[in-house]
Curated annotation (Swiss-Prot):
Keywords per UniProt: Cytoplasm, Elongation factor, GTP-binding, Methylation, Nucleotide-binding, Phosphoprotein, Protein biosynthesis
G2 as annotated region, ranges: 70-74
GO annotations of cellular component type: cytoplasm
Gene this chain is encoded by: EF1A
Annotated localization: Cytoplasm
Residue(s) carrying N6,N6,N6-trimethyllysine: 79, 187, 306, 396
Principal location: cytoplasm
Organism: Zea mays
Record's protein name: Elongation factor 1-alpha
Region (G5): 194-196
N6-methyllysine found at: 261
Amino acid sequence: MGKEKTHINIVVIGHVDSGKSTTTGHLIYKLGGIDKRVIERFEKEAAEMNKRSFKYAWVLDKLKAERERGITIDIALWKFETTKYYCTVIDAPGHRDFIKNMITGTSQADCAVLIIDSTTGGFEAGISKDGQTREHALLAFTLGVKQMICCCNKMDATTPKYSKARYDEIVKEVSSYLKKVGYNPDKIHFVPISGFEGDNMIERSTNLDWYKGPTLLEALDLINEPKRPSDKPLRLPLQDVYKIGGIGTVPVGRVETGVIKPGMVVTFGPTGLTTEVKSVEMHHEALQEALPGDNVGFNVKNVAVKDLKRGYVASGSKDDPAKEAASFTSQVIIMNHPGQIGNGYAPVLDCHTSHIAVKFAELVTKIDRRSGKELEKEPKFLKNGDAGMVKMVPTKPMVVETFSQYPPLGRFAVRDMRQTVAVGVIKSVEKKDPTGAKVTKAAAKKK
């Protein structure tokens, strides 16, 4: 078998008709875990429905439809393998909740694949002021997705077909935009492809022999291997807390940083409750330690279910334990708010697993969202497209961290009127020390 390949997460972004589904479907179809029988069934259905354009989007449409109907799709269907990596495609962004998911992210993407429609009119629509290309790229960068591959898609439909001139024009324009966002275009591969015909997806295309760079598959193999933050202090935001007969209280969540293991003394923020971890389980198997990315349940002693809630964060009691945030200052980008936002605005913040109302206590500065330079001190308000530094105060106890130290606990979505109206990253946190926090006997013994 040899060493198992590294797992990486990829987020596919781009304008609505750029061909994201077709391209992703194609990769999954050719390299992925979709059972041949399933494919044959899809192909037959596609033929019956006269969908000549079946190719690959159909695969993804079927998967999505089944997923949305609540049929649990084997997640392997969203995976494919390159020579070097196991790749998982995280939430394709056609989804309403894409932005929220990308932030509270079940997983941080290691690389964004930006799909561009190269056809006449298609490219212009995607990159225009209202197009999603810009917003997605800005979001990816703000949320710390530092690597990117850019696919100039639909090269089979440019005028003339497979036009080098069109490719060059697009690379020039997209590079200048990505540079403004903060990416370094010299480090980005621009791969001319056809997700539909398959040019340069996996094999080199003779139609594009003027292009000397990597195919999409090769570009994926050139992604820098991500470093997983297991050497940082533990942060494990709770998703749920169960009471299990004969075992006791079992909090469940995903290790974001650090490790958790049996025998450890953990402190839960924001309350400061401290106790010993008896056992750690993943998929019903006991673990000696759980690492970042692992979804685990762990059993704690002498703790009632009511003492823990979703959004609490487990941490090592001696290693920078998680504490309540009295206030925090964040860089916020306003995305789709119809009016203007001033001091006193009180939306809901989705940060890691917590969902808590906060107050915009003070608009500190308005900044240029690309360069980060200050434009104005203490602005009266922020509106769509603006970025600013904002001091926020939670209305209930909550744990947040700075983005630089604990990224998954330092990025958030601002929700109001049932949509994401802003995104932000936390620059500094003023923490409160817990008063009268309970320390269980098991933990006291360990001290």
